From Swiss-Prot:
Pfam families the UniProt entry points to: ATP-synt_DE (PF00401), ATP-synt_DE_N (PF02823)
Subunit structure: F-type ATPases have 2 components, CF(1) - the catalytic core - and CF(0) - the membrane proton channel. CF(1) has five subunits: alpha(3), beta(3), gamma(1), delta(1), epsilon(1). CF(0) has three main subunits: a, b and c.
Function: Produces ATP from ADP in the presence of a proton gradient across the membrane.
Membrane topology recorded in Swiss-Prot or TrEMBL: Peripheral membrane protein
Origin species: Anaeromyxobacter dehalogenans (strain 2CP-C)
Keyword Heme (UniProt): no
Major location (coarse): membrane
CDD domains per record: F1-ATPase_delta
Gene3D superfamilies, alphabetized: F0F1 ATP synthase delta/epsilon subunit, N-terminal
Name of the protein in its database record: ATP synthase epsilon chain
Family statement: Belongs to the ATPase epsilon chain family.
One GO CC term on file: proton-transporting ATP synthase complex
Superkingdom of this protein's organism: Bacteria
Annotated gene: atpC
């Protein structure tokens, strides 16, 4: 028996697979889910979502969202989700630099600061997952 992992974004169902374990970036810290985990739901931070399938790790960059665990099923409703091998590193690097430069022009009280900060975190997550 295994966990069912579904990753869904507003655009599409990204993934539906049987896995041994899921590790994700929760807003209160990273966590792991294995078979027969207690039900819960949490918000996700932009970061690396990892799942283990047959002893092999697979990595996705998620741009935040929510994760629910119930009945050996993990459902991820992500703002964005990209497999490590699908990330365009040059585009991610440019997005990171552009967002960082815009963020430097703002104070924490400025409108748009939190949105720009989130863009920096999403781009940083993509670069980290891509291994750059």
């Amino acid at each position: 028996m295994a966990l069912t992992l579904d990753i869904v974004t507003p655009e599409k169902r990204v993934l539906s697979v049987q896995v041994d374990e899921v590790r994700a970036p929760g807003v209160q810290g990273g966590f792991g889910v294995r078979l027969n985990h207690e039900p819960f739901m949490t918000a996700l931070e932009p970061g690396r979502l990892t799942y283990v399938e047959g002893g092999r790790e697979h990595h996705y960059a998620v741009g935040g969202g929510f994760l629910q665990v119930a009945d050996n099923r993990v459902i991820v409703l992500a703002d964005t989700a990209e497999a490590a091998g699908e990330i365009d590193v040059d585009r991610a690097r440019k997005a990171f630099e552009d967002a960082q430069n815009r963020l430097l022009q703002l104070t924490e009280q400025d409108e748009g600061h939190s949105a720009e900060s989130a863009r920096v975190r999403r781009a940083a997550a993509r670069l980290t997952v891509a291994g750059r």
